[in-house]
């Protein structure tokens, strides 16, 4: 499998031989869906909470007498039927949203994502990703010269200048190869991977 390599102007300047197992795998939509759902679920903090009818602030006084008013009977204002009443089945902070994905499935899922991105010409390789200064304006111009709007850069080791220059750009994300996740790969329109990061991804997932 050959992966297109682009230069500093975003033009295809060559190709890089890559593993078919990682970049030429058949697309598995169900597996990708499971991976993304698991990633988003595991990112949840799980701190949402509502109060039960015993926890809301209320009076224990009966709103009106049991019979004779013509209205529905009511015991207290903390009932879930009442405005500002407690929830019948409230969410609690100890709720666990963790979803487990086996290592074999995760590797297969990442491979199918990378393969589909390559087929859709959304994934390219680049010689290296560097920045002379930690200036956002300079790095933004560099990204613009590549002809990119919304892009994920993947490097083997994150350069400090690149990190500082890119962190305030809303449509640019820079990750190390070991940090790459399925959601980020699919979220951005283009994915640019440095050559040494490609080698590391092959070592991790093949």
Swiss-Prot record:
Residues 59-70 have a biased composition (Basic residues). Keywords: Ribonucleoprotein, Ribosomal protein, RNA-binding, rRNA-binding. Residues 46-95 are annotated as: Disordered. GO terms for cellular component: ribonucleoprotein complex; ribosome. The keyword rRNA-binding applies. It comes from the Bacteria. Gene3D superfamilies: 3.40.1370.10. Pfam families: Ribosomal_L4. InterPro entries: Ribosomal_uL4, Ribosomal_uL4-like, Ribosomal_uL4_dom_sf. GO terms for biological process: translation. GO terms for molecular function: rRNA binding; structural constituent of ribosome. Transmembrane segments: none annotated. The keyword RNA-binding applies. One of the primary rRNA binding proteins, this protein initially binds near the 5'-end of the 23S rRNA. It is important during the early stages of 50S assembly. It makes multiple contacts with different domains of the 23S rRNA in the assembled 50S subunit and ribosome. NCBIfam families: rplD_bact (TIGR03953). PANTHER family: 50S RIBOSOMAL PROTEIN L4, LARGE RIBOSOMAL SUBUNIT PROTEIN UL4M. Belongs to the universal ribosomal protein uL4 family. Part of the 50S ribosomal subunit. This is Large ribosomal subunit protein uL4. The lineage of its organism: Bacteria, Pseudomonadati, Pseudomonadota, Betaproteobacteria, Neisseriales. The gene is rplD.
């Amino acid at each position: 499998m050959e992966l297109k390599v682009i230069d500093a102007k975003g033009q295809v300047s060559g190709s890089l031989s890559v593993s078919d197992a990682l970049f030429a795998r058949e697309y598995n939509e169900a597996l990708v869906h499971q991976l993304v759902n698991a990633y988003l679920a595991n990112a949840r903090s799980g701190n949402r909470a509502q109060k039960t009818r015993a926890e809301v602030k209320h009076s224990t006084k009966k709103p009106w007498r049991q019979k004779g008013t013509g209205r529905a009977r009511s015991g207290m204002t903390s009932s879930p039927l009442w405005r500002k009443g407690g929830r019948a089945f409230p969410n609690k902070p100890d709720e666990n949203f963790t979803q487990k994905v086996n290592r074999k499935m995760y590797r297969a899922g990442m491979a199918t994502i990378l393969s589909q991105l390559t087929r859709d010409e959304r994934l390219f390789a680049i010689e290296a990703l560097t920045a002379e200064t930690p200036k956002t304006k300079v790095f933004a111009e560099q990204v613009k010269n590549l002809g990119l709007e919304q892009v994920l850069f993947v490097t083997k080791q994150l350069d400090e200048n690149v990190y500082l220059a890119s962190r305030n750009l809303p449509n640019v994300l820079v990750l190390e190869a070991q940090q790459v996740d399925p959601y980020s790969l699919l979220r951005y329109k283009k994915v640019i991977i440095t050559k040494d990061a490609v080698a590391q991804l092959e070592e991790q997932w093949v």
